[in-house]
Amino acid sequence: MEYETNFRKKHICSNCGRSGHEFRNCIEPITSYGIINVCISDEYNESMIIKDKFCTKKNTYYRVSSRKHPEISCFISNHIRVRDHENMYKLDNEMIPYRSNEDIHKFCYYKNRILFMMVSRRFSLGFIEFIRGKYDVSDTKSIINLFQHMYEHEIKFINKNRYKYDNILYHFLNRNNEPKKIVLNRIYEGKYSNEYCEAKIKFNMLLNSSNEENNNIPVYLEFYIKHIKPKWKSPEWGFPKGRRDKRSEENMVCACREFEEETGYKKSDYSVLNKIEPIEEKLTGTNGVNYKHIYYLAINNCDINSDLTDYDTYEIGEIKWFTYDEAMARIRPYHIEKKRILTRVYLFILNYLIHNINNT
């Protein structure tokens, strides 16, 4: 249950959700919440059996406001289950115990029938950090790292517009095909105006190699564009996730909202397996910042062959379904934790299917 009041808003951290401090003083990693949506290509109602076992509620929530105190609103989520630790399941399977030839037969049957929904990001993290000016103009190594983590077409776009930073910024922040002037005015006069003004200054410093004031810059933009090649030929893939929309937003509510916003799914299109404990991924970004991603497991309820047209085309490049092997191949080698999470989810479901489904 969520409570939202003017008093509590001042004392709840929008990152970790705890009271007593605000985001700028939070010592926890920057935290996002997401959904790992799984589809089982079944013939024996396996998806329904798993939902009956590990899911207790629908993915809905309601807002209740007080007439006497309209500044107070209460969010009641009927998919949020009061934790009973004795009945919560953990993704702690590290192997599949084969008890008979029938188990091996089931393994061969199910191993490629478990599919994972994954999304690719429209913009690479390297491109995002560069456009936002998250670098030191004199730190050649860090800028090389950003360009190595860009997509090839992003570097070409920077080269094409290298004398017009505002064109690059407009391309990056134009969500709704608004006129360029409106978008740029909102950027340079809005909440993050200082950030993008500083980013533009840095960009122009890298560009203007003839300016005597830039003598402390060892390498200029032309060098990075011409000589630094991306490490990866294909986009990075992961699971839908995002950060809290407001301080009082519950973890699972945030995960569901972000999942629905990014994929275009409706609440009836998936079921959160809320009797399974969420799984955490911890990592340090290329910018040296610590991050934590908390994922809830869900079972898909809709046709995976239907075209998804309502997803967030600003943030998401593509949405696809992959087998375990295909998904592992699309996760970058340095994302060891993400591979571990995928493997634990896969083994948990595979174990349950092998030892609890009778399809002989």
Curated annotation (Swiss-Prot):
InterPro entries in the cross-refs: NUDIX_hydrolase-like_dom_sf, NUDIX_hydrolase_dom, Nudix_hydrolase_domain, Znf_CCHC
Motif stretch (Nudix box): 242-264
Organism superkingdom: Viruses
GO biological process: AMP biosynthetic process; ATP biosynthetic process
Active-site residue list: 258 (nucleophile)
Entry keyword set: Hydrolase, Magnesium, Manganese, Metal-binding, Multifunctional enzyme, Zinc, Zinc-finger
Entry keyword annotation includes Zinc-finger: yes
Cofactor(s) needed for function: Mg(2+); Mn(2+)
Species of provenance: Acanthamoeba polyphaga mimivirus
Protein name per UniProt: Putative mRNA-decapping protein
Function: Might function as a decapping enzyme required for the removal of the 5'-end m7GpppN cap tethered to viral and host mRNAs to allow their decay in cells. In addition to the mRNA cap, probably also efficiently hydrolyzes diphosphoinositol polyphosphates.
Entry's EC annotation: 3.1.3.-, 3.6.1.52
UniProt enzyme class: hydrolase
Pfam families to which the protein is assigned, alphabetical: NUDIX
Zinc finger (CCHC-type): 11-28
Family indicated by similarity: Belongs to the Nudix hydrolase family. DIPP subfamily.
